[in-house]
Amino acid sequence: MKKEQLVADLEALCAPIVKEKGYDLYHIEYVKENNEYYLRLYIEKPEERISLRDCEIVSRALSDMLDIEDPIKDAYFLEVSSPGLNRRLHSDEHFNRFIGKEVFVGFKSSLSGRKNVKGILKDVQENEIIVECEGNEIKVPKDKIKTANLEGEI
């Protein structure tokens, strides 16, 4: 099974349990780091901070279900956490949600002589996002985005 399909299947299995516990699933990833596999889920609650106890509640519920369903054949570590203040933006839903907020966007390759841009996310279109930086609107094609993060406010 391809990784993308596995992640989609895992999201379909995990999202209802996360929701049942009173949280939203922000993002899920299955990665290999230093010869170890990790299933990472990032959870949130609208207008509330995520505590260690929140992560524990979701982790226990997911662990029980994953032991029964056994969707991952390799040994792996389950990690549940908050996406944090400087959360990664992965989808159009994430970008749209944070229009008007400060973001940092790194590019896969140079764009108009720049490697990245930091500014206010102004708009999200089908194939690009628009970031206002120092009074200029910079159009960033989505296929040029290497990483995008919300710049958290404390």
From Swiss-Prot:
Report which superkingdom the organism of origin falls in: Bacteria
Write out the GO biological process terms.
ribosomal small subunit assembly; translation
Signal sequence interval, chain numbering: none
Locations listed in the record: Cytoplasm
Q: Does the keyword Cytoplasm apply?
A: yes
User: What are the GO cellular component annotations?
Assistant: cytosol
Protein name per Swiss-Prot or TrEMBL: Ribosome maturation factor RimP
List, alphabetically, the NCBIfam families matched: PRK00092.3-1 (NF000934)
Is Lipid metabolism set as a keyword in this record? Answer: no
Q: What does this protein do?
A: Required for maturation of 30S ribosomal subunits.
The UniProt entry, under PANTHER family, shows: RIBOSOME MATURATION FACTOR RIMP
Q: Which UniProt keywords apply?
A: Cytoplasm, Ribosome biogenesis
Instruction: Report the sequence similarity comment from the record.
Output: Belongs to the RimP family.
Which SUPFAM superfamilies does the record cross-reference, listed alphabetically? Answer: YhbC-like, C-terminal domain, YhbC-like, N-terminal domain
